[in-house]
Amino acid sequence: MDAPLFRPLETFLGLPAGLPGPGSRAGVLGVPFDCGIHPFRVGAREGPAAVRHESRLIRRFHPLIGDADVPALLRAVDCGDVAITPGKPAEAFPRIEAAALSVLDAGAVPIGIGGDGAISLPLMRAAGRRHPGLVALHIDSHTDDYPADPADRYNPTTQFTCAAEDGAIDPALSWHVGIRGFTFRSGVLARSEALGFRVVAIDELLARGFAQTIAEFGEAVGGRPVYLCWDMDVFDPAVAPGVCTPSWGGLSAREGIALMRALAGLEIVAMDFNTVSPAQDIGGMAAGLCAHMIAEAMLLLAGRLGLLGAG
C-alpha cells in the first residue's frame, strides 16, 4: 500500500510541523489564550484548533493571483500552539512573546492565531524588540485602547493602551481601522486620539475606499515595519458569527478580502488574527473565513518578498 497508514496531526493548511528552518519566511503560531472575563462569550482559547480545522477547505494555489503554491514558496511551517494557561496573562504573555521571538529570530514572519484580542500585546512586544520603530495597523470594530487598571492591566480591551505605553509600537503612526458600533462609555475615540492613534471609522473607510485609505497609511508610515492585527469582529456577524464581541454593520467577506489585498506594499513583519470563538460559531463560518484571511495574508507576504513567479 503506497498511501501512508497514519495522517500527521492537523496543521494549518497541512503545513509541515515544527519551527522555521533555513529559508522559512513564515511561521504559524497558535495562541490558545483568552482572559476568560467576557460576561457572555468565552471560548476564543479554542480558536487556533478551529481555524486549523477549517483550513482543510483552503487550496494552496490562487490561479488569478500568482498561480503558485504560496505556502511552499514561503517554506511556511506550523509551529504548533504556545504552551500556556488561559486566564493567566501575567504568566502567559512572556511565553507568547518568547515563542514569537523564536520565529522572528529564525528570519520568519510570525502569524499568530488567537485567542482573544489580548494576544496581540505580547506579539507586538516581540515584533517591537526585533523591529524598532514598529507601527500597528489594527483592523477591528473596537479600538482596544481603554484605560488599563494598574492592578489588572491585561485584558482584551487594553492591549493597544499597553503597547503604546510600553513603547512596543509608535502610536503616532498607528491606525485603528474599521471602528463602529456602540460602546460601554463615552470618550472612547477621544482617548484613542489622546494616545496618538488615528481612528478610521468604518463609514469613512467605505466612503474613501480601501486603496485610498491604505495608501494614506503607507505614505504616513514611510516604509517603517508594520504589525498587522486583524480582529475577526471587523466582519459583520452575518459572515463571522463566532467572534467574542460581534458588532453589526461590519465588512462583508468580499470587502475584507479586498481590504487585505490593499495592504500590498506595506512592510508587514508580524501579524495576528484573533477573536474567533468556536463556541459561538455557526458551521465554522468565522473560523473558515479566518483561515482564508490568513491564506490571503500569506499571498500578500509572498508578493512583498518577490516570491510570486518564482515557483
Summary of predicted features, one role per range:
Residues 2-311:
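Conserved alpha-helical scaffold segments that buttress catalytic/binding sites
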